[in-house]
Regions:
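Chalcogenol-based redox active-site neighborhoods
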Residues: 1-143
Length: 143
């Protein structure tokens, strides 16, 4: 994420103490260094409420991932219930796609299944009714 110039924040309703215990007794056994981004506490769920992931009745937050552009606009979000983890590779792919679109000022867009280095589309009247000439459904799937 750092190589892409992306700031990652982890936010949960857990206290800083719980975050430390999780880092020291769980995460430290999975990676050989400290977590590479801040873990912030949202006790009371104010931030989670703003993003629609806080359950006030249970006092918990559903796992959510939000891609926010440099202008503060949410470009993508994914909300998953606890039994299913999110895909880091997919998050990176989406960030690269949004960065490409931003860098080209929308002159290029990424089709379904796009991967870095693969063909992009140029939106416009000429593409209408002709996407099939530029892109195939099989490109939406991993090899």
């Amino acid at each position: 994420f750092e190589k892409l110039g992306v700031t990652v924040l982890s936010i949960s309703v857990d206290s800083p103490f719980v975050h430390k215990i999780w880092n020291d007794h769980e995460l430290s056994k999975m990676i050989n260094k400290d977590i590479p981004f801040p873990m912030l506490s949202d006790q009371g769920g104010k931030i989670g409420t703003m993003y629609g992931v806080y359950n006030e009745e249970a006092g918990t937050e559903t796992r959510g991932r939000f891609i926010i552009d440099p202008d503060g606009v949410i470009q993508a979000f994914e909300v998953l219930t606890p039994p299913v983890g999110w895909n880091v590779s997919e998050a990176l792919r989406q960030i690269k796609a949004y960065q490409l679109v931003r860098e080209t000022k929308g002159k290029n867009v990424t089709p379904s299944g796009w991967q870095p280095g693969k063909k992009v589309l140029t939106p416009g009247i000429g593409l209408v009714g002709n996407i099939w000439k530029e892109w195939s459904v099989k490109e939406a799937f991993d090899d």
